[in-house]
């Protein structure tokens, strides 16, 4: 029996041990490759594990090199060119508060605010009034539910606050979403035309401050969920097809900050802290 064990058992055991060691070596090799960047901090090995896209610093075409007068630039010497660039540099930040309208009647043509929607707007207006922020201006969508929301908010803010209306920020499909929505699918022509309008609104409203602006601004834009979500993606240089993955409550606040050099950050997305649980809706 012992001789049989020696004859057959030992080779089998050796194979098992050898296989285990081989598997262990393979695992170690895999782990070494997976965590190689912890041992080697060269840019190549690090970036292989963390591929990153480039930030477009001139995303709004308001970098000084885009604003400078080309005819003056061609005639200027090095000192003159430096001066021209300095004159085109932004020095202030823009704080943009993207406000979604209150709850509205889905089954009515004009889609007026519901009683709850009006309460939401009142609570939002009080919060903005008590925020100690001196708002610079307000732009509102021309759609009924947004205009009604804006007018309720304005009752709580200084009467001399500059305000304007824009049809560019009306609701619409900004970009074909990924993944597709199960039940909502506008026709291709609607995407084609409405996406162009909403992109036009983004280019007009979302950009760094002009060189002439010397103080930080605090601007209110009262509009719609699709528009706001698209603006977020575009401003942060996220894929625009991801806009539908976010959900914004009625009368929520999304606070966008654009710095002088074009850097963008989000202070809050869909903030509804001014609403009690029984006042929250997402229609």
From Swiss-Prot:
Keywords in alphabetical order: Hydrolase, Membrane, Mitochondrion, Mitochondrion outer membrane, Transmembrane, Transmembrane helix
* Membrane-spanning ranges: 7-23
- Pfam families found in the cross-reference section: His_Phos_1
> One MF term from GO for this chain?
protein serine/threonine phosphatase activity
User: Has UniProt tagged this entry with the keyword Ligase?
Assistant: no
Q: Which GO terms describe its biological process?
A: positive regulation of mitochondrial fission; protein dephosphorylation
Catalyzed reaction equations? O-phospho-L-seryl-[protein] + H2O = L-seryl-[protein] + phosphate; O-phospho-L-threonyl-[protein] + H2O = L-threonyl-[protein] + phosphate
Q: Which residues form a coiled coil?
A: none
Q: Look up the EC number in the record and give it.
A: 3.1.3.16
Q: Where in the cell is it found?
A: Mitochondrion outer membrane
Which top EC class is given? hydrolase
- Origin, by domain of life? Eukaryota
State the membrane topology.
Single-pass membrane protein
Subunit structure and binding partners: Interacts with skn-1.
Q: What does this protein do?
A: Displays phosphatase activity for serine/threonine residues. Has apparently no phosphoglycerate mutase activity.
The entry sums up its family as follows: Belongs to the phosphoglycerate mutase family. BPG-dependent PGAM subfamily.
Q: What is this protein called?
A: Serine/threonine-protein phosphatase Pgam5, mitochondrial
* Originating species: Caenorhabditis briggsae
């Amino acid at each position: 029996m012992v001789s049989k064990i020696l004859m057959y058992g030992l080779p089998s055991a050796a194979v098992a041990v050898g296989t285990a060691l081989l598997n262990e070596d393979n695992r170690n090799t895999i782990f070494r490759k997976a965590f190689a960047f912890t041992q080697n901090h060269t840019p190549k090995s690090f970036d292989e594990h963390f591929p990153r896209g480039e930030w477009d610093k001139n995303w709004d075409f308001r970098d000084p090199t885009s604003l400078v007068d080309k005819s003056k630039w061609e005639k200027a010497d090095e000192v003159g060119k430096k001066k021209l660039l300095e004159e085109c540099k932004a020095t202030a930040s823009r704080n943009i508060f993207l406000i979604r309208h209150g709850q509205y009647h889905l089954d009515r043509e004009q889609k007026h605010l519901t009683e709850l929607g009006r309460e939401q707007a009142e609570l939002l207006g009080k919060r903005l009034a008590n925020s100690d922020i001196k708002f610079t201006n307000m732009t509102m969508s021309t759609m009924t539910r947004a205009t009604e929301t804006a007018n309720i908010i304005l009752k709580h803010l200084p009467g001399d606050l500059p305000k304007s209306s824009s049809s560019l920020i009306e609701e619409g499909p900004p970009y074909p979403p990924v993944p597709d929505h199960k039940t909502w699918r506008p026709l291709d022509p609607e995407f084609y035309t409405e996406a162009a309008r909403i992109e036009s609104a983004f280019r007009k409203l979302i950009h760094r401050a002009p060189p002439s602006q010397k103080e930080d601004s605090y601007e209110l834009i009262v509009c719609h969920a699709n528009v706001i979500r698209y603006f977020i993606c575009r401003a942060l240089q996220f894929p625009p097809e991801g806009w539908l993955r976010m959900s914004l409550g009625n009368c929520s606040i999304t606070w966008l900050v654009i710095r002088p050099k074009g850097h963008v950050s989000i202070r809050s997305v869909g903030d509804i802290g001014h609403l009690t649980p029984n006042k929250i809706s997402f229609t």
